[in-house]
Amino acid sequence: MSALLPLPGHHQQQLTWLERYAQTRALSDRLAAPLSAEDAMVQSMPDASPGKWHLAHTTWFFERFVLQADPAYRVFDPAWDFLFNSYYLSVGPMHARARRGVLSRPSLQQVRDYRAAVDVQMQQRLQAGRLDAEACTIVQLGIQHEQQHQELLLTDIKHALWSNPLQPAYRNAAAPSAALASTLRWHARDEQIVEIGAAAWPQSDTFAYDNESPRHRVLVGAHALANRVVTNAEFQEFIDAGGYRGAGTWLSDGWAMVQAQGWQHPLYWDVDGREFTLDGWRARDPHAPVSHLSMFEADAFARWAGARLPTEAEWEQAATGVPVQGNFVDTDALQPRGAEAVDTGIQQLFGDVWEWTGSAYLPYPGFAPWPGSLGEYNGKFMNAQWVLRGGSCATPASHLRASYRNFFPSDARWQFAGVRLAKDLP
């Protein structure tokens, strides 16, 4: 997808947004196409959502925040405002997140009809230049919001299919080509003050979520980052050394989780050298990045390896100025790939797996949430979560930037999340 460009003239900007809108909506439909109606309503755990709900909720976002601002617009179905509101308390009550799997109605076809109807209304307004500047900023946010749900649709259906006793595949694609991972090397940086974060949007022309702002200075100590993320083979060494059998390198809550949940290896692994993928069970590639780790597992591995997780400032310092290139949903592999064996540079900063950091998800100094209902988007979740950076094989490339902050609780395992090592230097 091409980036939004600040073209001259309000009407021309809206045409650019029209193209991005159509591309984004089409990708969601393509990702959902392999799902049967039964697949699309499964909710395998409270943290996940049915595919049908993702399709409807992203549509509700455009209808609720863009179309309903037009007094002439007629709501598709007023009852659906309750069903497909996620967490916007200022908008009204909502169906419980953990109960989304009971929504056998509306049907998948009705949800598709809903998407089509809203798309017609949105495209008419964008084509005719009938949205003011404020509405166009919400369109841009809605596109970014839908890209987030594209990744969640994939990770949620992967968990649902794995939870099915038959463990069917989402699709049947050829296995991605294996690459011999480069030798792990360290890239050292001296102590310095660095500036991280993004300029506030929409005051800035470049989109960024409110949790990425404001730009601010951070003292970063002398440290080194690994040139690539940790591989399956390296994580297997941790397992073979008894990593899941002793509390030694685990945080207290992490070890309690290992015991309570019976963790013995990353999610989707088995003991026979296989892993469950969106293409079904596959032989585990030893050179591919280890994924589906919780922060607890990533942290325990780093301690075992005599290292630590990078801070988000260290990660952003390394990623600033680096092109957003890698293995994303755009490549259609839908599985992490090994880094190419090269001698220089830091690899895999973008794509393949989200990288857990050692930074709690907290507001930056001077953080200000967006005004109105959209102020609920990020800020109210800034507790008991950790920052991840870089995107994954399920993230759209155009969604990412060096300042992007993802966040999940310490025990979350169903995302494409891995680990890059860091260490302090004297």
Outline where the language-model segments fall:
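Disulfide-stabilized, aromatic/cysteine-rich ligand-recognition loop
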Residues: 1-49, 53-121, 125, 133-140, ...
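Functional-site microenvironments in short loops/helix caps that host divalent-cation chemistry
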Residues: 142, 146-148, 152, 156, ...
